[in-house]
């Protein structure tokens, strides 16, 4: 990995010390007293640099924080709207920290601020990592499992695209009210929009190469602060939309790296292959790290969105680019955020495929997307989720469906959404449903309260489960009537089930359905829930004989969920 540069290329300046636990700012301490923050909360230093001769985005900054243990952590800084600069840092130890900040505004590096602060204990769960108990699971630093469930609400900063035109912070709260925990957001690379009227594209952080819009950046600040307040974790897609020559919506000509917009790249291929252009793109990674990397609620950085569908960019070009960018991020990130890349998946390739990226140690989350008329019917959708997760499982990584959806989802039942999120989770993956106004029938549907309720019920069901030791997908047990299918997450002595009724007669009441579980002899408690309303339907104790356990399901419509747990043997 390349060494971290001594001075970071980003903005800073002088004298205004602020310590904060997002989103509030702590009051200034009395003279001689050190400010305090909670462990894993944000500490922030703001200052001016009036004598600078460089553009704010070219100011070099290095902030060195020394922990109570003696560990030194180095971060950068950034310019803010209205002038001035800031450094953000998240302490991970309790006790007294010291810091020194140097900045170079054009006349050489000099110290612009120094000081200390105290860190008190907190119950914050910390950053999300790859789990230690299972290669396929994510977990908070405190060890609790994290199962991504939420939305690909890619331009949430544009209220006109949100349900009820909610501003982004309110939309984040709305997601949380429906039990979601993950939001995927695009940093747009197509920086001009043509509809409903021409103008700057919302979400374009880098309108010119190496120049970052502080007002747009502040919108991402607000999203992360709302995410921390409401328990949502954000995946930021760093280069999204803008690699298709001659197209309005994904215009390469509106990409700041394109020569058509004054950039250095004649073609998207130049962007992915030329080392000098990669070096320019690295500055965007470092800006995002310096501004947002402090946050434990930045779940992951997603390097690129659907390169196969945005310019038909081949895997032989974007996979090496992705590996390089992931290496740059990991080398610079003191917090260890996860890295992923939102490719379409092995079912849609251009030149080669993404298996080298799936197996790369620099790729932390194996992500793919799922759309298409082949999967409008819910049984086909559920089967494809199972197939794709199984196809991905052998790489030994957490699996995420970063987008799926169908604009024709029935608004009375939202059954496509329902079956998608339950079958994905019970196949062993995290899952994000796409939501947008109905522009494209193949994918776009708003996240109405009725649709959101399906996430709430699934989230509540998952919260009841015992996840330690981890639950893994099991072989599908035999089920009746013919065509009924059961998904199982389990471990020895404990199994969660989701049962989907047969395609024939789907939507009519199902009675006398069974699932045969191959479990050891003994006593078991079996509980069933209505997976649409969350109502508990039944609970009973059963005895398994040599042939296993036959579960007789309560009557249901379409699908039902249950838990089977072994009871202690009675002497």
Give the location of each predicted region.
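Non-catalytic, glycine-rich low-complexity segments
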Residues: 25-69, 75-76, 116-121, 479-488
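Aromatic- and carboxylate-lined catalytic core of secreted/periplasmic carbohydrate-active enzymes
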Residues: 32-37, 54-57, 396-399, 406-409, ...
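Catalytic-core region of carbohydrate-active enzymes that cleave or remodel glycosidic bonds
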Residues: 232, 328, 332-338, 360-442
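Active-site mouth of glycoside hydrolases
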Residues: 58-60, 122-365, 372-377, 384
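Extended acidic/polar, glycine-enriched regions
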Residues: 64, 71-133
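Bacterial N-terminal signal peptides that target proteins for export
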Residues: 2-10
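Sec-dependent N-terminal signal peptides
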Residues: 9-17
């Amino acid at each position: 990995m390349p060494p971290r540069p001594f001075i970071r290329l980003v903005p800073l300046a002088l004298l205004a010390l602020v310590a904060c636990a997002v989103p509030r700012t702590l009051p200034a301490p009395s003279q001689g007293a050190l400010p305090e923050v909670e462990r894993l909360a944000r500490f922030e230093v703001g200052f001016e640099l009036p004598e600078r001769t460089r553009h704010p985005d070219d100011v070099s900054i290095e902030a060195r924080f020394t922990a109570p243990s003696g560990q030194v952590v180095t971060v950068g800084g950034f310019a803010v709207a209205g002038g001035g600069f800031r450094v953000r840092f998240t302490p991970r130890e309790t006790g007294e920290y010291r810091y020194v900040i140097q900045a170079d505004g054009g006349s050489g590096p000099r110290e612009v601020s120094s000081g200390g602060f105290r860190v008190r204990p907190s119950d914050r769960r910390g950053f999300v990592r790859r789990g230690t108990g299972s290669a396929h699971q994510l977990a908070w630093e405190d060890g609790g499992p994290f199962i991504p469930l939420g939305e690909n609400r890619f331009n949430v900063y544009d209220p006109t695209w949100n349900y009820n035109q909610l501003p982004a912070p309110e939309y984040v709260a709305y997601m949380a009210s429906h039990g979601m925990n993950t939001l995927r957001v695009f940093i747009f690379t197509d920086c001009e929009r043509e509809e409903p009227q021409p103008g700057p594209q919302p979400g374009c952080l880098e309108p010119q190469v190496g120049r970052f819009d502080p007002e747009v950046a502040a919108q991402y600040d607000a999203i992360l602060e709302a995410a921390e307040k409401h328990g949502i974790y954000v995946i930021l897609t760093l280069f999204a939309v803008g690699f298709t020559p001659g197209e309005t919506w994904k215009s390469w000509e509106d990409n700041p790296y394109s020569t058509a917009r004054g950039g250095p790249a004649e073609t998207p291929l130049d962007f992915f292959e030329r080392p000098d252009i990669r070096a320019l793109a690295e500055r965007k990674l470092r800006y995002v790290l310096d501004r947002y990397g402090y946050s434990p609620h930045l779940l992951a950085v997603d390097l690129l969105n659907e390169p196969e569908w945005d310019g038909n960019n081949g895997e032989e070009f974007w996979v090496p680019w992705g590996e390089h960018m992931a290496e740059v991020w990991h080398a610079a990130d003191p917090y260890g955020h996860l890295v992923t890349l939102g490719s379409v998946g092995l079912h849609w390739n251009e030149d080669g495929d993404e298996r080298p990226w799936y197996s790369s140690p620099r790729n932390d989350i194996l992500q793919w997307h799922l759309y298409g008329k082949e999967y409008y019917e819910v049984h086909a959708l559920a089967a494809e989720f199972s197939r794709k997760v199984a196809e991905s499982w052998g790489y030994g990584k957490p699996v995420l469906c970063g987008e799926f959806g169908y604009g024709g989802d029935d608004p009375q039942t939202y059954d496509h959404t329902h079956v998608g999120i339950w079958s994905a989770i019970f196949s062993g993956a995290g899952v994000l449903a796409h939501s947008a106004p109905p522009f494209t029938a193949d994918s776009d549907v708003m996240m109405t309260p009725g649709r959101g309720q399906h996430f709430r019920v699934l989230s509540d069901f998952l919260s009841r489960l015992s996840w330690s030791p981890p639950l893994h997908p099991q072989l599908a047990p035999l089920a009746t009537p013919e065509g009924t299918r059961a998904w199982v997450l389990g471990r020895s002595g404990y199994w969660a089930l989701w049962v989907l009724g047969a395609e024939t007669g789907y939507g009519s009441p199902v009675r006398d359905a069974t699932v045969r579980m191959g479990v050891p002899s003994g006593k078991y408690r079996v509980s069933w829930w209505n997976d649409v309303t969350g109502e508990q339907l039944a609970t009973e104790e059963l005895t398994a004989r040599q042939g296993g356990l036959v579960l007789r399901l309560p009557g249901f419509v379409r699908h039902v969920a249950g838990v089977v747990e072994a009871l202690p043997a009675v002497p």
